[in-house]
Curated annotation (Swiss-Prot):
Disulfide bonds join C19-C23. The keyword Ubl conjugation does not apply. Crystallins are the dominant structural components of the vertebrate eye lens. It comes from the Eukaryota. It comes from Bos taurus (Bovine). Residues 2-40, 41-83, 89-129, 130-172 form the Beta/gamma crystallin 'Greek key' domain. Coiled coil: none annotated. This is Gamma-crystallin B. Keywords: Disulfide bond, Eye lens protein, Glycation, Glycoprotein, Repeat. The keyword Disulfide bond applies. Residues 84-88 are annotated as: Connecting peptide.
Length: 175
């Protein structure tokens, strides 16, 4: 079970709303979000309702302002609790759509796809075990995308506007 608290003002001030499960529409509970406290679980936050828009991965900790979670603004409109995975993690990435071209398998965090695999783009992928967060830039920076087990035949399937991938991280409650 997870617990996350959203605050309208920076520094955990102002009106707050506590959540413990997926919520496709947070708009009725607060108008803006400038700080967050994650007491338990790993969460993916979304800029718009129904799990749309920019995504932000948060694990246990305090985030006193939206820059701390790499937010572009104070808009958080939906959230998803990511189920904890206790087994191994495994993903296959491909340089072309529909699982074509060079394939590389990943089983742990990768801070730079360029350094490890000489890749800057991933056009399709297959998440075999565990949930992952894909980052547009190296060192876990830039736009973020939640990847749950399943097939992603093209980058549009994970919500990206292009195939640029800089780093990948396993979703775990600790690092």
């Amino acid at each position: 079970m997870g617990k996350i608290t959203f605050y309208e003002d920076r520094g955990f001030q102002g009106h707050c709303y506590e959540c413990s499960s997926d919520c496709p529409n947070l708009q009725p509970y607060f108008s803006r979000c400038n700080s967050i406290r994650v007491d338990s679980g790993c969460w993916m936050l979304y800029e718009r309702p129904n799990y749309q828009g920019h995504q932000y991965f948060l694990r246990r900790g305090d985030y006193p302002d939206y820059q701390q979670w790499m937010g572009f603004n104070d808009s958080i409109r939906s959230c998803r609790l990511i189920p904890q995975h206790t087994g191994t993690f495994r993903m296959r990435i491909y340089e072309r759509d529909d699982f074509r071209g060079q394939m590389s398998e990943i089983t742990d965090d990768c801070p730079s796809l360029q350094d490890r695999f000489h890749l800057t783009e991933v056009h399709s992928l297959n998440v075999l075990e565990g949930s992952w967060v894909l980052y547009e830039m190296p060192s876990y920076r830039g736009r973020q995308y939640l990847l749950r087990p399943g097939e992603y035949r093209r980058y549009l399937d994970w919500g990206a506007m292009n195939a640029k991938v800089g780093s990948l991280r396993r979703v775990m409650d600790f690092y």
